[in-house]
Amino acid sequence: MPEKRTLDAFFAPSAKRPREAEAEPVSTSKHSAYPFDIADFPATLAKELSPPNIPDKPGQTIDDKQDLDLLYFDPFVPKLQARQLFEFLRAELPFYRVQYKIKRGGIETEIKTPRWTTVFGLDETSRFKDGRVVDAESEVLVADGRYTRYPPRPIPQCLETLRRATEAATGCKFNFCLVNYYASGADSISYHSDDERFLGRDPTIASFSLGAQRDFLMKHKTAPESLKLALGSGAMILMRGTTQSRWLHSIPKRTGKNSEDGGRINITFRRAMTKDGTENYYNYNVGRGPMYRWDRIRREMRQRNE
C-alpha cells in the first residue's frame, strides 16, 4: 500500500512543535497523460506563493544595452519558499533525459540533452475542458490528430499557482511551463534564443531560478554587447520585446569546486500560439525515452516505469 504523503515528506519538521501539527495532507493533480498523479502544494505553501505574498521585491528594468528589454526580480520568490519550491518540484515532477537527432552539414547527429527536462501546457488553438482537449473557438473535442504523437499535459496545481502569480505580476499571459533540472555544474544549456515562429513576434518569457546559483550569460547576435547575471534562488527574469530576436542566452557548465552545487531548477513560462509549439515542446522536453523521478534516499534521479 503506498505511503501516505504529508507535508513532512517535503520539509523538515520543527522540533519545537508536535509532529501532529506538521502533518498536512497533500492532494494531487490527475490527468490521463501524466505518468503519475502529481502532488499539489500544501495549502500553506500555495498561499505563500500567491499574491500579495509574491513577488518579494519589485522588478528592475534592464534596458541599457542595444535591443535588450528585461525585468529582473531579485528575488521574486522569498528565500525560504524558494528552497521549499525547489525541493518540492524536484521530488514531485516527472523528468526526462531526452535524446534526439539533428542534421549538421548533412550529417545526422544524436544529441543527448545535458539536463533533466519536463513540460506542461497547450497552445492557443486548443484548451483543456474537463481534462479533454477541445478547440479553443468551437469547444469541440479535438479529433483531427494534431496531438496524437504527444498527448498534452495540463499544468498541475503546483506550477499553475506560480503561473498565475507570474501573470498577475507581469500582466502577461502564458500557456506553457517548461522545467529544467540541472543536477550539477556538469549540466548546462548552450547559447540559444527562444524565437521560434510558434511563439509569435517579440515573445515574452518568464524564467525562474531555484536552488544553486548559476551564471546566466547573454550576448547580442550581431553587436559586441554582453551581460552576465548571477542568478540566485528565487530570482526571475522577464525577457520581452526584441530580446529573443536579437540576443542569445545560456547557462554554462561549472567546474572544479563549484561543480557539485546541489542542483538548480529553472522554470520558464511562455505562450505558444500554434500547434507546432505543442509538438516542439513535448518532443524536446519529454520525447520517447524513459521517465525519471527523484529518489530521496539515493539523492539522484532514478528511472521509473510509467
Predicted regions, residues:
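Non-heme Fe(II) oxygenase metal-center motifs and adjacent flexible, charged/small-residue loops
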Residues: 2-306
